[in-house]
A protein has these predicted regions:
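Small-residue-enriched transmembrane helix starts and helix-helix packing motifs
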Residues: 70-91, 165-169, 198-212
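Alpha-helical transmembrane segments of helical membrane proteins, especially in multi-pass transport
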Residues: 172-180, 202-230
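Hydrophobic alpha-helical transmembrane segments in multi-pass integral membrane proteins
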Residues: 134-141, 213, 266-277
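Histidine-/acidic- and/or cysteine-rich, low-complexity loops and terminal segments associated
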Residues: 1-86, 145, 149-154, 176-197, ...
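Interfacial loop-to-transmembrane junctions
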Residues: 3-5, 242-266
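Juxtamembrane transmembrane-helix termini in multi-pass membrane transport proteins
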Residues: 82-127, 131
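Final/C-terminal transmembrane alpha-helix of multipass membrane proteins
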Residues: 14-20, 257-275
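Transmembrane alpha-helix/helix-exit interface in multi-pass inner-membrane proteins
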Residues: 131-146, 160-187
């Protein structure tokens, strides 16, 4: 019976991930954006980022149709519309990174006094923290749109801002805070052994702690969505892949700092292009 419960829980977990990705794809289609988060047809147009932003502003004054029907773009500039989008995005991008953590807890079900209720508690606590982060980054997006730093698709209007964001996230990869947070995400078993609590409530408490460290580790990759657009499925896929790799016990420590160098160089290149472009 326990094997059946385990299978149902894992299948449900992966079903939620797949559903979340499908919903993000459906929203992108509904908003009329392509796989890199630009309005359909923008890839064939020339000009710099400022010209592109102006064209998109004209596009977003109308309505765009998709498989799910027509929806005015202005609806995606309010907290009520953006917050659910970010919550779904958190599920699509961050739940896959939790697989090693849930597997570690499963080991304690067989070797210690872990329970399936505790497993669910860990999962819920982890996701609650990311839902809270979704509220924060939704507020940040609204503030950036109000300041005209990004457009209504979450795309940076300034190469300087995009370059600065790359550099800040890249530099964070070398900080002590990143090292501590990544250490917990990279070795969840150590966290469980040092903060062990039994039952659903105990799992929930540990999940909240793990979620907080995970936000501390990965917030920058979420913020990078403001470079190319928060509806960019390409960015979502690449960021998810990197965060999964970064948390793998075998190779996670080897990719953190190289990624920082790449991001810093990308930031310098982006800002430099803003000067000469």
């Amino acid at each position: 019976m326990s094997g059946v419960v385990r299978s149902v829980l894992w299948l449900s977990f992966f079903a939620v991930i797949l559903l979340s990705w499908w919903m993000m794809f459906a929203m992108a289609q509904m908003m009329g954006v392509d796989w890199i988060g630009r309005p359909q047809g923008m890839m064939d147009m020339g000009g710099g980022m400022d010209g592109m932003s102006g064209t998109m502003s004209n596009t977003m004054n109308g309505t765009m149709s998709g498989e799910m029907g027509d929806m005015p773009m202005m609806q995606m500039t309010t907290f009520g519309a953006l917050f659910p989008m970010w919550v779904i995005m958190m599920a699509a991008m961050m739940l896959p990174t939790m697989v090693p953590t849930l597997r570690s807890y499963e080991d304690l079900i067989s070797s210690a006094n872990g329970t399936r209720a505790g497993w669910l508690g860990v999962l819920l606590g982890y996701f609650v923290v990311w839902v809270a982060f979704a509220a924060v980054i939704t507020g940040a997006q609204i503030a950036l749109m109000a300041s005209d730093i990004i457009d209504d698709l979450g795309i940076s209007n300034s190469l300087w801002f995009a370059g600065l964001l790359f550099i800040v996230v890249g530099l964070f990869q070398f900080t002590r805070a990143k090292e501590i947070c990544h250490g917990v995400c990279h070795s969840p078993m150590s966290y469980f052994l040092g903060h062990w609590k039994t039952g659903f409530a105990g799992g929930l408490r540990m999940g909240l702690g793990l979620g907080a460290f995970c936000v501390g580790c990965c917030w920058g990759f979420m913020a990078l969505g403001f470079v190319g657009g928060v509806m960019s499925l390409l960015w979502m896929g690449l960021a998810t892949l990197f965060m999964v790799i970064e948390k793998l016990p075998q190779i996670g420590h080897y990719v953190t700092k190289p990624a920082g160098f790449v991001l810093i160089l990308a930031g310098i290149g982006t800002a430099g292009y803003g000067v000469i472009g």
